[in-house]
Amino acid sequence: AISKGFKVGVAAFPDGHPASAANPTQDLDVLAQKAKLGASFATTQFFFDVNKWEQLVSALAKKGVNIPVIPGILPITNLKQLNRMADLSGTSIPDSVANRINSVSESDVSKVGIEIATEFSEELLKAGAPGLHFFTMNNSDSTYQIVQNLNIAK
């Protein structure tokens, strides 16, 4: 049992866990088991498709699991870093994102990446996300700009 007032967060994988060969049923069962063992919330690996978050939350609810699932956002500030992180995590980069990033010069990648992350964050919040988790990659400036764009800072 977990002490009263103490919360435990666990990982969730909208694109599938890299070690599970993208077996959504297995990933969902593991996440549901984490919740049944006392997890208070889940934070996802970064991803780029709001439908995947909605499907994950819906599938958990069908299993009777209603913990908050906080989506992970990776502000794209560097193309090389994005590709490396996607390879390591098994996260897919939608054509719509890749096309926008690949259509600009390296010096504009961060600007467009912030636009993409802002739009994605807006979609997630509109879909009911309980909050957002940013993978800052030691670059809090981009996250600060996204929060300003969302007009959620106090």
Q: What is the predicted role of each segment?
A:
Residues 1-16, 26, 58, 62-114, ...:
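Active-site pocket-lining/capping segments in soluble small-molecule metabolic enzymes
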Residues 40-49, 133-136:
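Catalytic beta/alpha-barrel core
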Residues 22-37:
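Active-site glycine-rich loop that binds ribose-phosphate moieties when present
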Residues 34, 38, 71, 132:
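Conserved, mostly hydrophobic/aromatic
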Residues 27, 31, 53, 113, ...:
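Aromatic/hydrophobic pocket-lining residues that form the small-molecule binding cavity
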Residues 1-6, 37, 119-131:
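A structural motif corresponding to the C-terminal end of an alpha-helix
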Residues 1, 20-25, 46-62, 139-150:
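Active-site-adjacent beta->alpha loops and helix N-cap segments on the catalytic face
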